[in-house]
């Protein structure tokens, strides 16, 4: 449970992580501002308070929340694809991660948060409103259906996907939503290196790049082997993908 007088160490952990991120090339100036850290702390308070009545997250200790939700969400700060993106879709956002921390940092970019679980997404919408984030929209929809929707298909400059599934599956969820020339950031652990080989066919069929850039961020999350797997989109996704709801997870490419 979140306590209003949470130990100062929680804020210190957050400030230390934000200071590391602020040193990155192309990191926005706002990341070093007190008001941004205040926004993240308020987001944590909102999540943990609501988590007492609705299951939003299994991470309930504030120190772990700072590390595994807030700082982990911000691992992509300073990367060129994020810097140039204007429209971003967060696939399987749940209660708003990584979308909300990034939307608060980049108010000039538009974020669409999608999820198949209505209650979590309703909370994300509530949190966005509470935090004054007018650059966030939410949509209750399965990823497969979103990828076949003409208003969403190949619309976004960047797709984010965190803690949703294995690479062969989530590649089919995300690549159809991204325009040619765009990219997908998959938040994974280095244990996913085996999944990378398994997802080669999916990338080939869906228009993704053969080469995948992997960025470790152990400096941001000491002791955690987390990484971003970055896939560029080189070609248009064939009309046959994504397949119908439930098929990608049952029969991965």
Regions found by a protein language model. Give the residues of each.
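Residue-level signal for inorganic ion chemistry
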Residues: 47, 102, 124, 188, ...
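SAM/dcSAM-binding transferase cores
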Residues: 200-253
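Short "lid" loop at the C-terminus of a central beta-strand within the Rossmann-like core
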Residues: 144, 189-194
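Helix-to-beta-strand junctions that scaffold the AdoMet/dcAdoMet cofactor pocket
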Residues: 106, 178-180
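Class I SAM-dependent transferase core
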Residues: 1-84, 89, 119, 126-136
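Conserved SAM/SAH cofactor-binding pocket of Class I
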Residues: 63, 74-165, 171
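Conserved beta-strand signature within the Rossmann-like core of class I S-adenosyl-L-methionine
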Residues: 181-191
């Amino acid at each position: 449970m979140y306590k209003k007088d949470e130990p100062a160490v929680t804020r210190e952990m957050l400030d230390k992580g934000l200071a590391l991120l602020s040193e990155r090339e192309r990191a926005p100036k706002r990341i070093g501002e007190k008001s941004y850290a205040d926004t993240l702390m308020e987001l944590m308070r909102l999540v943990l308070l609501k988590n007492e009545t609705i299951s939003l997250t299994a991470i309930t200790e504030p120190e772990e929340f700072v590390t595994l939700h807030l700082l982990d969400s911000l691992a992509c700060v300073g990367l060129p694809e994020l810097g140039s993106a204007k429209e971003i879709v967060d696939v399987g956002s749940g209660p708003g991660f990584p979308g909300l921390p990034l939307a608060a940092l980049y108010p000039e970019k538009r974020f669409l948060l999608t999820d198949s679980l209505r209650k979590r997404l309703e909370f994300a919408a509530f949190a966005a409103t509470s935090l004054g984030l007018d650059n966030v929209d939410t949509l209750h929809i399965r990823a497969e259906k979103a990828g076949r929707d003409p208003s969403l298909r190949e619309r976004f400059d960047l797709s984010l996907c965190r803690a949703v599934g294995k690479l062969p599956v989530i590649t089919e969820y995300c690549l159809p939503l991204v325009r040619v020339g765009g990219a997908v950031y998959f938040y994974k652990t280095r244990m996913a290196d085996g999944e990378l080989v398994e997802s080669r066919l999916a990338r080939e069929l869906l228009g993704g790049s053969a080469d995948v850039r992997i960025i470790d961020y152990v400096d941001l999350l000491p002791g955690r082997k987390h990484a971003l797997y970055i896939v560029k989109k080189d070609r248009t996704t064939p009309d046959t993908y994504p397949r119908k709801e439930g098929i990608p997870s049952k029969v991965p490419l």
